[in-house]
């Protein structure tokens, strides 16, 4: 027991030394240096002491070091000075912080410098717009791989919606964002997945909730056709009638099992996205342009996660269970049909006198 206490004490001491050293290094002079004491004094005066600070923001000292450069950048940019975010890794970490809804930690630490949330959101949007083209090239890609169980098909398409606040006081003005299917005001996004890898290949712009799935697809049908290059894609019943614009395989309720199993992959992708980035699991309170930027960014990071942890392998047990249920349901329907057919034939034979009573 004493050895465990000693080891823990030594580890905490090393963490304190590392924390203090990195904090000191973070305040090295820049073009217009800001002393560490100036920022630290404001923060401590707001919370009282260091223990109360870490208890309030609910993070440990090592985690606090990751946020330190971001906090200083937000605080110093308020004064028009050079920020502390200098590397791409730190900027991407800032974006992932927002997508994971841990931006409140940054807001609490800069509360003495920035009174509103708008300034932080503007900073995030500027960074996101700068990195989004590079991330799209690297992570939103199409492998053009076919699967043997669904011949001639290379993509899966579906739409998903996010609730937004009512855009106007009068219902006629806000009717465009109202979805009769979901019964709420929402924004709609369409995602085309690679059928084998499960990564997003095409992400449409946002549309009001009243726009149908077919209208969303027809708005960028040329891009989809260029990516398909003669192959087809899987879609649900909401896309019936779009075959004239884009080669589509409509998966009906009683379609063969491989197509149904493959089409469910897009639902798994939406679930993975909302699981990783909780900011998309709740109502979106910002503007439509901001929604487009951060949704595309979330798809880039989700693609990276899917390539590391494939959807099909991660959900293999669940998918096997769904496949078995579908197969059992189909067998039950066929068996019921056989029984009813035999009963009908026997009754008709009896009525026509071909069989004894």
Residue ranges and their predicted role:
Residues 101-357:
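Short, well-ordered secondary-structure "scaffold" segments embedded in the functional core
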């Amino acid at each position: 027991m004493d050895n465990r206490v000693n080891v823990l004490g030594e580890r905490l001491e090393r963490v304190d030394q590392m924390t203090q050293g990195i904090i000191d290094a973070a305040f090295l002079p820049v073009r217009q240096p800001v002393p560490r004491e100036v920022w630290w004094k404001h923060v401590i005066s707001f919370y009282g002491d260091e223990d109360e600070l870490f208890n309030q923001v609910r993070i440990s000292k090592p985690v606090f070091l990751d946020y330190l450069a971001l906090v200083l950048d937000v605080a110093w940019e308020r004064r028009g000075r050079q920020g502390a975010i200098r590397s791409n890794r730190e900027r991407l970490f800032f974006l992932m912080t927002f997508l994971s809804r841990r931006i409140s930690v940054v807001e609490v630490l800069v509360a003495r410098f920035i009174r509103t949330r708008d300034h932080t959101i503007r900073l995030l949007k500027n960074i996101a717009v700068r990195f989004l083209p590079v991330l799209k090239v690297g992570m939103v890609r199409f492998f053009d791989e076919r699967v043997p169980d669904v011949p001639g098909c290379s993509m899966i398409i579906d739409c998903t919606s996010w609730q937004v606040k009512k855009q106007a006081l009068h219902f006629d003005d806000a009717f465009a964002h109202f979805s009769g299917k979901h019964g709420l005001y929402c924004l709609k996004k369409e995602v085309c997945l690679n059928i084998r890898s499960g990564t997003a290949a095409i992400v449409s712009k946002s549309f009001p909730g009243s726009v149908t799935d077919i209208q969303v697809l027809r708005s960028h049908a040329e891009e989809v056709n260029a990516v398909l290059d003669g192959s087809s894609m899987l879609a649900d019943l909401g896309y019936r009638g779009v075959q004239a614009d884009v080669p589509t395989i409509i998966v009906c309720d009683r379609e063969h099992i491989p197509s149904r199993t493959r089409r469910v992959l897009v639902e798994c992708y939406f679930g993975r996205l909302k699981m990783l980035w909780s900011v998309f699991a709740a109502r979106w309170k910002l503007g439509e342009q901001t929604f487009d930027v951060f949704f595309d960014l979330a798809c880039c990071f989700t693609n990276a996660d899917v390539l590391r942890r494939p959807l099909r392998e991660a959900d293999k047990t669940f998918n096997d269970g769904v496949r078995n249920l579908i197969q059992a349901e189909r067998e039950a329907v066929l068996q019921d049909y056989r029984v009813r057919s035999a009963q009908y034939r026997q009754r008709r034979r009896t009525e026509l006198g071909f069989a004894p009573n």
